[in-house]
């Protein structure tokens, strides 16, 4: 039996018991995929990260990301949380830049102190791209319990985007409509595109109206399943959402930063920072950033 240390962080927040929880299991050399999946199921968090030595010695670590049911090629809150956890573990309290190896590819991360708390941001390894969506937007709205007039605002329309993980981006009229969504799993399974052989793409609902004045968008992300569940902060969805922002809002050339609020309806308020660099009217690069705070640590006897 081997002892392995783990850390528990709340990500995309500066407050404990808010944001999106993440388990980071250290020293995972020797663990196979089956064991990692079983441990992730034991933690039963939205994601668990397993830290391994890097394939490239110039990089900091390799990480593998698991939900309780499957491995993911990339996810935002595990990247932010892992970057902060590994920097703090190494005693790196100042600014630092390093690369984490994920299944999607190398991810460049920067860790610093921001607003008095640890803050990490990473460059998207893959820029968002539009995918074909065959489902009727009104049917998508109905699967969320919304009327046709509540779907869309300004020039924003239902779309399908991916920056490694695909999401159906669904604009709704206002906060009241966003607060009423209830996913009908049966209806969703009949119309939603798949993100993999075993899972449907998740709906990412957003509106321009926000609770916090510094936020640019209010969002909710529901993971379909039996039962479905809500995610308090979803970095990979924010990465995909960058495509919708570029397509519908057409930001001018330069660097723009905006905050996305999520998790308020479920009592886990979260804030995700999205940075867009636009050149010649096209998205040249994008970054996802956020805070994280350590909540607990412990040992696994596996």
Curated annotation (Swiss-Prot):
Annotated GO CC locations: cytoplasm
Its GO biological process annotations read: biosynthetic process
Q: Which residues form the active site?
A: 47
Q: Which UniProt keywords apply?
A: Isomerase
* Cysteines joined through disulfide linkages: none
What are the coiled-coil residue ranges?
A: none
The record's NCBIfam families line, in alphabetical order, gives:
PhzF_family (TIGR00654)
Under PANTHER family, the record lists: ANTISENSE-ENHANCING SEQUENCE 1, PHENAZINE BIOSYNTHESIS PROTEIN
Tell me what this protein is called.
Uncharacterized isomerase mll1393
What is the organism lineage in this UniProt record? Bacteria, Pseudomonadati, Pseudomonadota, Alphaproteobacteria, Hyphomicrobiales
């Amino acid at each position: 039996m081997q002892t392995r240390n783990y850390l528990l962080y709340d990500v995309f927040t500066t407050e404990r018991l808010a944001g999106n929880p993440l388990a980071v299991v250290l020293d995972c050399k020797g663990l196979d995929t089956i064991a990692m999946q079983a441990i992730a199921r034991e933690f039963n968090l939205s994601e668990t990260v397993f830290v391994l030595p890097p394939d490239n010695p110039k990089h900091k670590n390799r990480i593998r990301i698991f939900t309780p049911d499957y491995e993911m090629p990339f996810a935002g809150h595990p990247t932010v949380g892992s970057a902060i956890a590994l920097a703090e573990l190494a005693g790196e309290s100042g600014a630092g830049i390093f690369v984490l190896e994920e299944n999607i590819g190398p991810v460049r991360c920067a860790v610093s102190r921001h607003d008095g708390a640890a803050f990490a941001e990473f460059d998207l390894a893959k820029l968002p791209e539009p995918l074909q969506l065959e489902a009727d937007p009104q049917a998508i709205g109905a699967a969320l319990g919304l009327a046709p007039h509540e779907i869309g605002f300004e020039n924003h329309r239902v779309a399908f985007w991916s920056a490694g993980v695909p999401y159906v981006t669904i604009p709704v009229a206002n906060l009241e409509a966003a607060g009423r969504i209830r996913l009908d799993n049966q209806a969703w399974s009949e119309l939603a595109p798949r993100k993999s052989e075993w899972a449907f793409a998740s709906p990412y609902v957003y509106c321009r109206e926000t609770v916090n004045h510094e936020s640019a968008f209010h969002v909710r992300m529901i993971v379909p399943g039996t039962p479905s569940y809500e995610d308090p902060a979803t970095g990979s969805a924010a990465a995909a959402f960058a495509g919708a922002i570029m397509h519908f809002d057409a930001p001018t050339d330069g660097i723009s930063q905006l905050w996305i609020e999520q998790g308020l309806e479920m009592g886990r308020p979260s804030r995700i920072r999205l940075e867009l660099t636009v050149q010649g009217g096209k998205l040249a690069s994008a970054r996802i950033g956020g805070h994280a705070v350590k909540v607990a640590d412990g040992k696994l006897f596996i």
